[in-house]
Amino acid sequence: IKLFIQQRCKCLAWNIQSDKIINMSLKIILIMGLPGAGKTTLANELVKKIKAKRLNADEVRKVANDWDFSEEGRKRQAKRMSDFALKLKNEGNNVIADFICPTPEARKLFPADYIVWVDTIKSGRFDDTNKMFVKPEKFDFHVTSQNAKEWSERILTDLSKNV
């Protein structure tokens, strides 16, 4: 898996820089929530404001060719995302990862330094995910409506307080 990560990291993570970049200690930021809640949209906005590499769960699944959404498959995906995120952080990058991370067990496998819960919909696009999803007890920031530009600014402010 280590070789796979080294070969694939460069095509799965990308940089977007802006004039609003803040200085902070290296962080792995997890943006989690139900499918269709706005995780990817928020991640795309936030990565414009923070010098970071971005990991999208769907892209990682595509490269791994692993479309198993069972509980075991989701744990495997969380571990895979964890491996990518840690490698990128160890290379000196902030990391923004967006994925469902539906269960406490999956969340324990992912080493987030800062967790954003995107809680904008009552149910997602997939019944099996809705049934499996457990609302997180622990998070650093709670997004309650779909306005990625506004929420990314609020998250940036919160992150700058916790530098």
Regions found by a protein language model. Name each.
Residues 31:
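Hydrophobic anchor at the beta1->P-loop junction of P-loop NTPases
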Residues 35:
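The conserved Walker
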Residues 39:
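Conserved lysine of the Walker
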Residues 43-83:
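Conserved substrate/cofactor phosphate-moiety recognition/catalytic segment
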Residues 72-123:
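Glycine-rich phosphate-binding loop used to anchor ATP phosphates in small-molecule kinases
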Residues 109, 118-163:
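Small-molecule kinase domains that catalyze NTP-dependent phosphoryl transfer to phosphate-bearing small molecules
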